[in-house]
Amino acid sequence: MLPVNRARALLTILSQAKTLNHTQQVHAKVIIHGFEDEVVLGSSLTNAYIQSNRLDFATSSFNRIPCWKRNRHSWNTILSGYSKSKTCCYSDVLLLYNRMRRHCDGVDSFNLVFAIKACVGLGLLENGILIHGLAMKNGLDKDDYVAPSLVEMYAQLGTMESAQKVFDEIPVRNSVLWGVLMKGYLKYSKDPEVFRLFCLMRDTGLALDALTLICLVKACGNVFAGKVGKCVHGVSIRRSFIDQSDYLQASIIDMYVKCRLLDNARKLFETSVDRNVVMWTTLISGFAKCERAVEAFDLFRQMLRESILPNQCTLAAILVSCSSLGSLRHGKSVHGYMIRNGIEMDAVNFTSFIDMYARCGNIQMARTVFDMMPERNVISWSSMINAFGINGLFEEALDCFHKMKSQNVVPNSVTFVSLLSACSHSGNVKEGWKQFESMTRDYGVVPEEEHYACMVDLLGRAGEIGEAKSFIDNMPVKPMASAWGALLSACRIHKEVDLAGEIAEKLLSMEPEKSSVYVLLSNIYADAGMWEMVNCVRRKMGIKGYRKHVGQSATEVG
């Protein structure tokens, strides 16, 4: 057989190789017949080893091709292997790209994309700009593969203005390019820009793809646009994207959870075939945050029955449910599960256990967990201060605050929320004012919504309703719903019925979908024996489709 025919035969056999063993057998024949330095066979061997996830063999095969014989195809083959490999770092890709530039004339869209992605991974914007210039020089900056990579590079490393400029200069834009730009705006929390781009893309007549829908549904979750999110879900079903992308399914579930549409989230979750730990955790966390703790526990048990191992985030979420239920037994069972399965506790878990034990009334166990921590940061100290506070142990909370400072841990915004909450639970108005003034003067912590709400709660609990109302009216920022909510709760305690009606109106103008305001106002009128007003409020609830949920508790006594 002529050498050319023999080489072609080996290429055919190599293209049919299915396993690493088959590839090595063909490689042996290539060596025997002296074809190892041939660029076509060498490149094909390199690719075959890459497909078998043996980058070491691929590199060895590539290196046996003489430098003067290597062409763009052979360089792109090895570059693709390094780019896709989980064992190599971005610096290896960039080093290989620089070697190619020294030994091979010209560039193409493939090796430019590999180099740009490596620059993004390494955070090398200046190198990326040089590659952008090279792409422009070779007329490839508007290529269907290169352009999205450049937009992503500027979105990740530069500014969205730069990314938008590159995007605007591209005359023909495909759906990938639109999706990459939307993804960039999502990173910078510019959700309105995502909606704007979607409308512009739709007007061009381009078909939507999974990336576009994922960006759109994430933006819906960020701004709590549940109705729009439902429409996106509908589109993804009609165009069959929902069955093709697990990530899209997970994103829609996350959107429903953020919008508190938990029943919609669970319905989609139940139809998902590949339910991974992220999906389980998202749903469990959603039920826990919405105080539907029993359902969160049911999901957690179902997760374990299906042999899905929980991660640290799952366990932190289920501990929120333990706190919500006030169930020490459930909390201890989770603690025991972690110990039995050798799961190491991180700072988040330690803090979650402190909070859970404190809310279940076992302050001694909360303190034990705190003492077990190998390292204590400002979050763990703040959590312990809060633990003392919610159990009415103000002196211990204040002592913990002073100990934290003695350990050179600087209090932050969360610390003062915990401390002001402790003042509120103990009714210590004087100390509350002292700490509120100190936080800015001594520590540079600017009061936020939660700090103002704590002060309103403190004054309200102490019966200083007028001063609490005056405090809200004179706040340097626009009062948020949490501050008005704290005052409404105080109105119930101190039977300030007229003021309660006024505050409820303000709250409903800010959060018209919040049914808990109607429930609290109804209870205030009921406490005052104003049954006509109770019926009036409940009729409004009925018109809006709200109903009073029966509370669930597992608080243990004895």
From Swiss-Prot:
It is found in: Mitochondrion. This is Pentatricopeptide repeat-containing protein At1g06140, mitochondrial. GO terms for biological process: mitochondrial mRNA modification. It comes from the Eukaryota. Residues 483-558 are annotated as: Type E motif. PANTHER family: PENTATRICOPEPTIDE REPEAT-CONTAINING PROTEIN. Residues 1-79 form a transit peptide. The keyword Signal does not apply. GO terms for molecular function: RNA binding. Its main location: mitochondrion. Keywords: Mitochondrion, Repeat, Transit peptide. Belongs to the PPR family. PCMP-E subfamily. PPR repeats lie at residues 38-68, 71-103, 108-142, 143-173, 174-208, 209-243, 245-275, 276-310, 311-345, 346-376, 377-411, 412-447, 448-482. One of its GO terms (cellular component) is mitochondrion. The keyword Mitochondrion applies.
